[in-house]
């Protein structure tokens, strides 16, 4: 690796760093050493989830990629060096010694305002960093190239370049370009960045030295599974046979029960025919009895009808005599006259009572109206009150005079009715006005509530066109310019001049401003959309030209009382108010060309004009304007709601009076018609008394005698008529009963025919071979002396019992069939009446050759054992032996170096946990031709069987531990000297930091050496805070070992270790930081030949 270029990375704006074969990076704490190392992490590891920034800081590190990209400062005034949108580049240059050419790798990161990141990785062959441009020029200004433009340019300049958005694809391409490195490179590279104690040597070896080797056991498992399947199939055949035999037995029981039920059904049908014949005989006897009873009732009815007719004639005779009597006629006439007169007199009395009561109510209503106080919407006139007083007195007079009145009262009531009609009309008009006012108030209330809600959300109530234009510009300009509404960016210094400022600026408070260089663009957008969005009337300030007004303010001007949030806004205020002078009073206005008083009297072009209150009463300027608007709006809302309540009360009150006064004029005309009611009542009473006197003088003795005779014959007629009715009713009942019995007899005869037919059809419905037995059972049943009904009940109970047994057995049969179908995937019909399908299945199983099955099972087990010995054992033994050879090579290289008096060696030995399996795997006596079950050593044979069972039983992946050859080994690192041998596992718990760091670096270097077995690789090792706990001698020995292994070193080291490493390093880079900018100094440079390519050293001979 020759160079690293950092653009917009933390505090590096654009820095190129040169590397030699042995490079150390130093600087004060916080200067930015780890920043360089973390840039290499982003470049090599690429997957952000796998990167631990500033990893040498252990758990205290809390850096993130976005903090590096933006350059986190951490102060409230300025949290980051870079804000908004920008692009970062991290680029490295490598020299391929074998090919004799350079290549470049890198990453570009677009960072957006919301911290969203877009990454693109690139690998450029046959190129150098100085051949690539990362900047572009616009308007004589130098800008970092955007990602899209950069990638487009790279594709054109270097057609063979690899550009990837996927970190995974980039990682694969990068490892291939680095010499076909194993993917373990990423973990080893990250682990080397800081000292981390190796608490598990086996885990370290797995990740950094020994590769996983997939050992296929599929064939062995498949053979064993075939054996298991055959074994299961044999067991299944036996189970099937047993299940089918059970189904067959149950079916035979069902057939027996079905035959019993069939015979019982034959007997029951015969008994049912005998019973229906008995019922027919009973119906015929009942018909004879009903016909006899009907004849007697008809004879009695005829005789009673003759007696009733004689009584009716006598009754008619006496009715004629009474009707022709003169006394009867006069008596009836007088009674009818008296009854009619009483009725009409009663009606008049009722009308009079209602009339008098209405007069009292009317007097009360008129008195209430006369006392009505009125309000601003309605009040009574003096004339109206005078008319009401006269009308009230008239009503009171009539009420106390029993409703009787004359011409004067008639005239008074007519005038009162006309007055009340006019008053009611006025109430109607006032109510309409109030309802219109109520609607206006509700509209105002709704608007105020909306404004208050917006203000509480800190949203000023601007005209819709202002908000639309602001939103439109923000959408199109995005990060190119901010968009302001003037009033939001202003603050008033002295509240005394608030009204003058609000009123003088008026709608200019809502003018929209953009940054000067974007005004022309904003104006084009405004012009394009002004009619589509209804934007007319909104002010868009030419901020570019207005900058000339900044600072041009006359002393004593209104501009002194207001301040803008930025120079663009301030220029606007200086333009609008810089020449408007503050006047103490209205007379002082004339001293100036343009002026205004604190009371909002303006003076301009020789015209004085008071600014309307509605213009300035709602404040918009400044941070406190929203709160002031909110207070004003809430106060207005209270006033409107109070007025709404008052108006609502008035409407309700007026409608009450409208209802009271409705139809008064018509009512009063009816009252006038009732003035003569008393005279009419007196006339009726006089006539009633006269007719009663005449009625009392009539002689009615002869008439009473005739009436007595009529009464006697009437009683006899009623008696005969009742008897005749009773007889008619009895005749109807007898006929109805006779009809019912005849219908029942018809049904019985029909039923008897059907039952007989059903009995005969039995032989077609059931098995014909049962007929003879059924006929015998029938004869036995009817030969007893018991009633047919009792016999039938007995047979029904027996049949029901057999049916229940049959249903139970049938259900059990179907359950067994269903279970068999589900368990054996059989397509038999569960509800089938016969058992043919299951009988056929049973027959097939009975014909199978079971011994042949057993022989096949034995042979497949032997095949699985042979595969286990010939493949698995041999391959596992070979993998373990290869691992030992690999560690021998590493130990051969490590044996050439001493740390003081110490030499290091990897120790590999059988795993304690899996030792029994290890021993049998490595036992040369285990050969493919020897069966597991015929092995001479019984203990070893049992272990082999155990291992075999673990591998073939269970799902794939359950016993992966026995397939990985590394699990059969344990690993350690020994430290050897004249005093003996110690092991790293013990050293980590006992020794000092330097003594524990040395094994760490030995192990890490061994890991890299293993990764770089192929000569043509990058051979790069990077350490952060390297060797910080080692003494000088250990550091120098470690550096020499790195050289001897032909590794390129880049190490960030503490200041105090710099002197110890200078003798062995060929390049020293010092990181400096001033404020929030970092740069590098190179104190010693690589030799001229190293600038072309790193020197080759004959270290591979030690390993090969």
UniProtKB/Swiss-Prot annotation:
Pfam families hit by this protein: AAA_29, SbcC_Walker_B
Gene3D superfamilies: 3.40.1140.10, P-loop containing nucleotide triphosphate hydrolases (3.40.50.300)
InterPro entries in UniProt: P-loop_NTPase
Disruption of the gene: reported phenotype: When this gene is missing the Wadjet system does not confer plasmid-transformation resistance in B.subtilis.
A Gene Ontology BP annotation from the UniProt entry: double-strand break repair
Transmembrane segments: none
Function: Component of antiplasmid transformation system Wadjet type I, composed of JetA, JetB, JetC and JetD. Expression of Wadjet type I in B.subtilis (strain BEST7003) reduces the transformation efficiency of plasmid pHCMC05. May be an ATPase.
Annotated PANTHER family: DNA REPLICATION AND REPAIR PROTEIN RECF
Protein name per the record: Wadjet protein JetC
Organism the protein comes from: Bacillus cereus (strain Q1)
Gene from which the chain derives: jetC
């Amino acid at each position: 690796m020759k160079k690293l270029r950092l653009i917009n990375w933390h505090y590096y704006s654009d820095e190129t760093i040169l590397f030699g074969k042995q490079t150390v990076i130093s600087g004060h704490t916080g200067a930015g050493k780890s920043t360089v190392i973390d840039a290499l992490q982003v470049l090599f590891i690429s997957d952000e989830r796998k990167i631990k920034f500033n990893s040498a800081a252990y758990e205290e590190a809390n850096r993130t990629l976005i903090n590096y990209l933006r350059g986190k400062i951490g102060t409230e005034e300025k949290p980051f060096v870079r804000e908004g949108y920008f692009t970062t580049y991290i680029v490295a240059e490598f020299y391929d010694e074998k090919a004799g050419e350079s290549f470049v790798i890198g990453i570009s990161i677009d960072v957006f305002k919301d911290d969203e990141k877009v990454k693109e990785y690139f690998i450029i062959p046959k190129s150098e960093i100085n051949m690539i441009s990362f900047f572009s020029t616009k308007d004589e200004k130098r800008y970092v190239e955007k990602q899209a433009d950069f990638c487009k340019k790279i594709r054109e300049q270097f057609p063979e370049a690899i550009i990837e958005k996927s970190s995974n694809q980039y990682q694969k391409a990068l490892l291939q370009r680095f010499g076909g490195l194993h993917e373990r490179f990423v973990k080893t590279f990250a682990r080397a960045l800081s000292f981390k104690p190796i608490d598990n040597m086996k885990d370290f070896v797995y990740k950094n030295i020994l590769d996983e080797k997939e050992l296929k056991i599929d064939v062995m498992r498949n053979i064993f599974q075939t054996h298991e399947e055959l074994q299961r199939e044999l067991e299944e055949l036996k189970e099937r046979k047993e299940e089918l035999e059970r189904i067959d037995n149950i079916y035979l029981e069902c057939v027996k029960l079905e035959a019993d039920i069939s015979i019982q059904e034959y007997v029951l049908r015969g008994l049912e025919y005998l019973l229906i014949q008995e019922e027919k005989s009973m119906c015929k006897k009942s018909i004879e009895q009903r016909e006899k009873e009907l004849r007697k009732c008809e004879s009695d009815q005829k005789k009673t009808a003759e007696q009733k007719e004689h009584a009716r004639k006598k009754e008619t005779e006496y009715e004629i005599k009474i009707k022709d009597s003169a006394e009867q006629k006069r008596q009836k006439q007088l009674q009818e006259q008296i009854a009619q007169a009483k009725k009409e007199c009663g009606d008049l009395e009722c009308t009079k009572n209602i009339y008098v009561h209405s007069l009292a109510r009317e007097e009360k209503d008129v008195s209430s109206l006369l006392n009505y106080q009125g309000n601003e919407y309605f009040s009574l006139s003096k004339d109206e009150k005078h008319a009401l007083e006269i009308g009230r007195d008239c009503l009171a007079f009539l009420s106390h005079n029993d409703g009787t009145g004359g011409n004067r009262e008639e005239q008074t009531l007519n005038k009162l009715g006309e007055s009340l009609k006019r008053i009611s009309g006025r109430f109607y008009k006032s109510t309409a006005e109030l309802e219109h006012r109520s609607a206006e108030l509700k509209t105002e209330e709704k608007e105020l509530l909306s404004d208050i809600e917006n203000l509480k959300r800190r949203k000023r109530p601007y005209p819709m066109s202002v908000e639309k234009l602001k939103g439109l510009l923000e959408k199109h300009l995005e990060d190119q310019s901010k968009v302001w509404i003037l009033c939001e960016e202003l603050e008033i210094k002295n509240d005394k001049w608030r009204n003058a400022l609000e009123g003088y600026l008026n709608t200019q408070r809502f003018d929209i401003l953009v940054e000067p260089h974007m005004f022309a663009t904003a104006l084009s957008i405004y012009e394009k959309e002004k009619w589509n969005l209804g934007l007319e009337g909104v002010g868009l300030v030419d901020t570019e030209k207005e900058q000339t007004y900044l600072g041009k303010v006359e002393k004593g001007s209104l501009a002194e009382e207001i301040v803008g949030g930025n120079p663009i806004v301030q220029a606007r205020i200086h333009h609008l108010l810089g020449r408007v002078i503050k006047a103490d009073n209205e007379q002082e206005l004339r001293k100036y060309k343009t002026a205004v008083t604190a009371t909002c009297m303006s003076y301009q072009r020789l015209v004085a004009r008071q600014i309307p209150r509605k213009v300035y009463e709602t404040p918009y300027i400044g941070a406190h304007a929203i709160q002031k608007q909110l207070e004003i709006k809430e106060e207005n809302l209270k006033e409107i709601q109070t007025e709404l309540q008052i108006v609502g009360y008035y409407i309700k009150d007026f409608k009450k009076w409208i209802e009271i006064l409705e139809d008064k004029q018509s009512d009063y005309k009816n009252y006038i018609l009732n003035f003569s009611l008393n005279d009419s009542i007196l006339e009726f009473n006089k006539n009633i008394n006269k007719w009663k006197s005449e009625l009392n003088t009539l002689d009615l003795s002869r008439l009473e005698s005739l009436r007595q005779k009529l009464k006697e014959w009437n009683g006899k007629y009623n008696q005969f008529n009742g008897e005749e009715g009773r007889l008619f009713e009895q005749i109807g009942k007898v006929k109805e009963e006779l009809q019912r019995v005849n219908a029942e007899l018809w049904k019985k005869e029909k039923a008897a025919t059907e039952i007989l037919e059903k009995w005969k059809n039995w032989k077609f419905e059931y098995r014909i071979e049962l007929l003879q037995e059924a006929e015998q059972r029938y004869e036995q049943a009817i030969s007893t002396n018991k009633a047919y009904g009792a016999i039938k009940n007995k047979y029904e109970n027996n049949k029901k019992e057999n049916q229940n047994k049959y249903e139970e057995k049938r259900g059990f049969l179907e359950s067994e069939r269903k279970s068999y179908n589900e368990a054996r995937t059989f397509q038999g019909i569960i509800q089938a009446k016969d058992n043919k399908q299951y009988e056929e299945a049973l027959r097939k199983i009975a014909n199978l050759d079971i011994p042949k099955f057993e022989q096949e099972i034995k042979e497949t087990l032997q095949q699985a054992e042979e595969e286990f010995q010939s493949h698995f054992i041999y391959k596992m033994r070979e993998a373990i032996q290869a691992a030992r050879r690999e560690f021998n090579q590493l130990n051969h290289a490590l044996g050439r170096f001493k740390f003081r008096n110490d030499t290091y060696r990897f120790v590999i030995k059988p795993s304690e946990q899996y030792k029994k399996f290890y021993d049998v795997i490595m036992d040369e006596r285990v050969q493919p031709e020897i069966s597991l079950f015929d092995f001479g050593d019984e203990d070893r044979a049992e272990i082999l069987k155990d291992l075999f069972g673990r591998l073939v039983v269970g799902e794939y992946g359950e016993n992966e531990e026995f397939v990985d050859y590394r699990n059969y080994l344990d690993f350690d690192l020994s430290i050897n000297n004249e005093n003996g041998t110690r092991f790293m596992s013990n050293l980590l718990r006992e020794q000092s930091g330097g003594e524990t760091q040395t094994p760490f670096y030995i192990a890490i270097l061994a890991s890299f050496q293993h990764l770089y077995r192929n000569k043509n690789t990058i051979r790069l090792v990077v350490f952060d805070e390297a060797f910080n706990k080692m003494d000088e001698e250990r550091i120098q020995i470690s550096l020499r070992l790195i050289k001897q292994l032909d590794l390129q070193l880049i190490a960030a080291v503490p200041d105090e270790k710099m002197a110890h490493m200078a003798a062995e390093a060929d390049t020293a880079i010092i990181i400096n930081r001033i404020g929030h900018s970092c740069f590098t100094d190179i104190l010693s440079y690589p030799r001229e030949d190293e600038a072309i390519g790193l020197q080759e050293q004959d270290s591979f001979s030690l390993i090969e």
